[in-house]
Design a protein with these regions (language model features):
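Aromatic-Pro/Gly-enriched surface loop or interdomain linker
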Residues: 1-27
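Long, C-terminal catalytic modules of enzymes
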Residues: 71, 75-186
């Protein structure tokens, strides 16, 4: 939000929890929304709300990474409790028997991709790999010069690297650790 404030933009903050409970009606007043975070853990209600918003002509600036990855739910009784059943992803551990299903809904956990809701279908890119290493900045690509999206790049030079500075997590650059990619097969 620092950049929005520095540029004197009026904005509202909507949390994942708000979106889960209130649905697409919460988004409908806005022409454009943006994810300024790491929206990795989204529930079906959140995905449905975003999909409905986009289908109604809303626009999304997806500024995060590794988004919309794990099947997630917010407990309808203990509303402060988020449940995630991780299996089938990067295999940082193996789920034990009986741990593939969410206890709050009975639905299969794991990856949204395995449930037919790949993030690539929603936002064009999705998580594909992770690993340590020196991060890198981004160079503008030809589509970034399309007049329809020129406002996104106001103040950024044609040859300027995006994220060409140290960061707090992986030492340097706008990209590192987790990698998203396009996949037209999904």
């Amino acid at each position: 939000t620092d950049w929005l404030e520095a540029q004197a933009f009026d904005f509202d903050v909507i949390t994942d929890e708000d979106l889960h409970w209130e649905g697409s009606a919460l988004l409908s007043p806005y022409r454009v929304i943006l994810t300024g975070s790491h929206p990795e853990y989204w529930s079906e209600q959140m995905l449905d709300a975003l999909t409905d918003y986009l289908n109604q002509g809303g626009r999304l600036m997806y500024l995060g990474g590794n988004g919309f990855y794990w099947v997630t739910n917010i407990d309808p009784v203990l509303r402060h409790t988020v449940e995630i059943r991780r299996w089938g992803g990067t295999q940082t551990w193996g789920a034990q028997p009986g741990e593939h299903y969410l206890s709050t809904t009975g639905e299969m956990g794991g990856l949204w991709r395995a449930r037919g809701r790949a993030p690539q279908r929603l936002v064009g890119v999705g998580f594909t790999a992770q690993g340590p290493g020196h991060g890198m900045p981004f160079a503008r690509q030809p589509d970034s010069f399309d007049p329809r999206v020129s406002f996104i790049f106001e103040g950024i030079g044609d040859e300027e690297l995006i994220g060409d500075f140290p960061n707090l997590v992986m030492e340097y650059g706008a990209s590192s650790f987790e990698i998203d990619r396009m996949d037209f097969q999904l």
